């Protein structure tokens, strides 16, 4: 409703401050958008480091006198109608937006929406243990070690979350099995596919994440031992 179909608006990338113009083409539970011109496409690709990516990024939508916290991915897919050098469209998510195939909001997009709104720390602290694990795994797949660190207990010596960005290109969560909270502890099990930089192989893993409730902080944090599980080939 804020961005009617075929409306144009400006987006600002939170990390770089770079802006570009876009048009909403379709979408109902989230917006399918396209860069407006070839120059806008070039600006978007610059924001993504010169390569298209499914990674989510925090953005602010500037529409009239409104500033709306949002999240994008940077991968052209599907149909595109504008002559802009962008082969398809990409997705723009807001608070509680969902994808075409799932009824629940996308965890990675929601992390970035709240980052854009200046509520990242609060949002992570308010998540239940299952949703926190999903958010941490998604951010690990993006190599966003700064956000991963916000969701985990201090890693032991020899475990460096920074290795995620250096080694892992992507993590695909194929399915998950939720656990039960017992004595301030929650364990979730995930079947994931891990892809490493410079390696075309798919590494299928079954990993376990354990969250512990930190009474002094009033929130959940994930134990960091899952990092070693992800990084083992």
PLM-predicted stretches and their roles:
Residues 23-30, 71-78, 210-214:
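A short, sequence-level motif marking secondary-structure junctions
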Residues 145-187, 195, 200-203:
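Short solvent-exposed beta->alpha transition segments
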Residues 85-122, 228-231:
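C-terminal partner/receptor-binding element of secreted or periplasmic proteins
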Residues 117-163:
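Core segments of small alpha/beta cavity-forming domains
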Residues 1-2, 74, 182-233:
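Exposed beta-sheet edge and beta->alpha loop/turn motif
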Residues 1-7, 27-57:
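N-terminal post-signal-peptidase region of extra-cytosolic proteins
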